[in-house]
Amino acid sequence: MIITLKQNAAAEEVSRLRGELEAQGFVIHPVEGTRYNILGLIGDTASLDARQIESLDFVDKVTRIQEPYKKANRKFHPDDSVINVGGVLIGGGHFAVMAGPCSVETPEQVIETAKACKEAGATILRGGAFKPRTSPYSFQGMGPEGLELLELAKKETGLPIVSEVMDISQLQYFDNVDMLQIGARNMQNFTLLKEVGKLNKPVLLKRGLSATYEEWLMAAEYIMSEGNEQVVLCERGIRTFETKTRNTLDVTAIPMMHELSHLPIIMDPSHAAGMSRMVRPLSLASVGGGADGLMIEVHNDPSKALCDGPQALRPDQFTSLMKEVIALRQALVECTK
């Protein structure tokens, strides 16, 4: 339930109402918006008389939320959330580009790639140290040593880093990682979601291969319900009947998520197509669709990559793409003036 307050609502009256509702066992989530302030109620509100609350002089209206996700709901939080990742803002008009190798392999590889990404305009360095692979015989990542190399690249470039955590036991190694990534396969690993929800660290939540929008937002709700509301959604392609591409990038998710939720949404065109030649058009489509950022795989030598080389861009290709992304972003801003 959402209680929308009038602009002239007295603090004493609002505090009294909050106290009465909390005494009944409800968790109150106050939100101060640019247009109005609200009190979000979490709990079983079936017994509450909405008309009685609405009759209070300082209450504008009462709205019951039908969707199962509350904290991730746009109705619960009308203004766009802005997430701070090591000084880089995402959402609310702030656009971020996460770029780097699928997996960390050598000091030279990650540092060379990181420097090239920063020079081209990337704002966050991505890199995998723990890799969830379809085959148990494939390269599984360097583990803690890979995270140390990412930290080294961070010191060299100043770029904050995002890396995937696959299991609760791995969290002990992520103290110096600026943003935790929950991969598509772990989107409904509820134990892991709850654990990262207890941390004061931004989380990048990738959509599951066959997840609906509601299932995706409910996964975000698991994180937020534990206290961590620093969540960024990432669409990375879903499984459809099409076989020409690895996955199908759901561009519709951008406006739909902006309508349903206040959380930022970024797009991962690299994993969606699985082919480097598709990254450019899918990236531009994502920018045009209103995405809050991009996540792009870049490798200094894709032909020698130990993981997903065919979908990685070379530094020169990424540089060319970033010029187009920046130009398109500027054009869109001009169109809205």
Predicted regions and their residues:
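Active-site mouth loops of central-metabolism enzymes
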Residues: 95-112, 136-140, 160-164, 183-185, ...
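Non-catalytic terminal accessory/regulatory regions of metabolic enzymes
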Residues: 1-97
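Hydrophobic faces of well-ordered beta-strands that scaffold small-molecule active sites
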Residues: 96-101, 125-127, 161-163, 180-182, ...
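Alpha-helix-loop-beta-strand connector modules within alpha/beta enzyme cores
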Residues: 139-163, 195-202, 251-265, 311-334
